[in-house]
Design a protein with these regions (language model features):
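Catalytic-domain carbohydrate-binding cleft regions of carbohydrate-active enzymes
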Residues: 1-196
Length: 196
């Protein structure tokens, strides 16, 4: 979609409203607001404001505005949209940003501290991370058990405390296409982690 085009924003909002908001969903999770394009080169993106390599970074700003304008038109003033990306100024649209699908490593945790500080310095107050990382993390590993405890400790000081991820150690006992992930909460890693 091209959220820089006002007509596109109106069209997409109408679909979102009809399929979600009118059915009681009033907090939306907009993933892939970077935008996610393949191959991953902004020069492959053409927007109404110009070529992607010139204006592509503004994409998440208008992506957030899409929901905000629609909710405002409905008379809402308590608007929050969870988004994987933002642009300076998107905070006025109630954008709650998380850092995306990140690995479950101590290096990634270190980078989240920097990312959170950078977001705050950009004036975007609602920022969070996938506590424990999004992908990886062997639930049987002592290193991962330590990591998730430390990440929970960091998460307490983030503006939004959010746990989300896909862990190794999937439940393959049921005959389903996508098995359930392994434990993803501190309490699932034994008394030591829970006590901390």
């Amino acid at each position: 979609i091209d959220p820089t085009n006002p007509d596109t924003r109106k069209y997409v909002w109408q679909r979102v409203k009809e399929n979600y908001v009118d059915n009681g969903v009033d907090l939306l999770w907009f993933d892939e607001a970077e935008p996610e394009i393949h191959p991953e080169h902004f020069d492959n993106l053409i927007l109404s404001l110009g070529n992607g390599d010139e204006v592509g970074l503004i994409y998440p700003y208008y992506y957030a505005q899409l929901v905000y304008d629609g909710m405002k038109e409905m008379g809402r003033d308590d608007i929050v949209t969870l988004s994987r990306c933002a642009y300076i100024g998107a905070q006025k649209f109630g954008t709650l940003v998380w850092s995306g699908d990140i690995p479950s490593t101590f290096e990634s945790l270190r980078k989240q501290v920097k990312s959170g500080l950078n977001m705050a310095m950009c004036g975007i107050p609602w920022w969070t991370t996938d506590i424990g990382g999004f992908y990886g993390g062997d639930i049987e590993s002592d290193e991962f058990r330590e990591l998730i405890v430390r990440w929970f400790q960091y998460g307490v000081f983030c503006p939004v405390f959010r746990l989300h991820g896909s862990r190794n150690g999937h439940d393959r006992t049921r005959d389903i296409i996508e098995p359930s992930g392994g434990d993803n909460e501190v309490g699932g890693f034994g008394d030591r982690g829970y006590g901390i």
